Amino acid sequence: IATLAIYTAPLQLKYDGRIGGRLDADLVLPMIKLYERTNTRCEAGWAATQEILLRRADKTLFESDEVIRLLVEHSGGHPRELLHLLRLCCELAPGNSIDHATAQAAIGRLAADYRRWLTPEDYALLCEIDRTPEHGGNDERAQRLLHRLALMEYNDGSWRRSHPVIRTLEGYVRAAAQ
């Protein structure tokens, strides 16, 4: 039987030395770039990310275009995070539509997942990388943040930025103020 199989695995496995050489060629899908390194909006990335969202949920499900924009923005351009936010919205919505309050609650819930494991040192490094995106950070801490999606990589790794939901957390705000 001729078949084509696609396996997906967490990004951490790609960098795990214990399985090196045991897998066939791998393909790591990039984040969809919502912003350029200069922080100008990348319209093509926004359109692509919004299209992913609207292929999963009808536009009439959302109270407004602003709710769609909010979810796209806080996904950081990562399709899995976008769909995670959509799932949280569906779980949290009090009725049959997703309003601004529901989207904010979903963002807060996703942010809480990160807050549980991020340390003050992690926040400081994320702020440093956000101030200087080409800094990148290739030490063990930066690699851990990258593997756990607290740090997002764009343009084949040429620059990085913290996950947008992390920027809503008090720990990040405190570190950014220092």
What positions do the PLM features span?
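The catalytic "switch" region of P-loop NTPases
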Residues: 1-68
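C-terminal alpha-helical "lid" subdomain
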Residues: 59-74, 79-178
